[in-house]
């Protein structure tokens, strides 16, 4: 009820897509309570998604939403969303928010700020400016940006039924996940669970992604 799905998305993408639902790390594994073991909680979530691509090789895309809270600094939020749109914008308009979030910072100011030609240069600006505000770039935003250089960003809408959080739609092509992430979260599962390749699925085949090297400056 927040996003409009185009016919092209419904026909060409959705049948081969898994939605990334909300995840919650239980208290005993949160870093503030668990110390070092909590640092691996987010990695465990990625490991689970990597396993899905092995046992369900027909899945080609992950669709989900990045959530930001109303308490986050407004100018910082605007900078992050502008940056995402500049470097990951969905030009085909496969998915669009029904009521797009309107940024409070002027487009001219943001365009002047993020004036570089590469992801790496603009990312340095973003990270510096966010820190000046006393904040950090949300971990999941960094995580998604470092997962694939071809991620698509579909715009942002407010979820009035879930605490007015601001949700940004994204799409990641499984076979375009960066090589180091593929090895870390997918190849390791294949090596430790060889029998998983024999599990039944809707289509035959084993996930064999092409190697995708980082675009210049994709953050890690």
Task: Please describe what each predicted stretch is.
Residues 1-151, 155:
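Acyl-donor binding region in acyl/amide transferases
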Residues 155-162:
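Short proline/glycine-enriched turn/loop segments at secondary-structure junctions
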Residues 1-23, 148, 152, 166-220:
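Non-catalytic substrate-recognition and accessory regions of acyl/acetyltransferase enzymes
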Residues 73-75, 163-168:
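Short, solvent-exposed polar/charged micro-motifs at secondary-structure junctions
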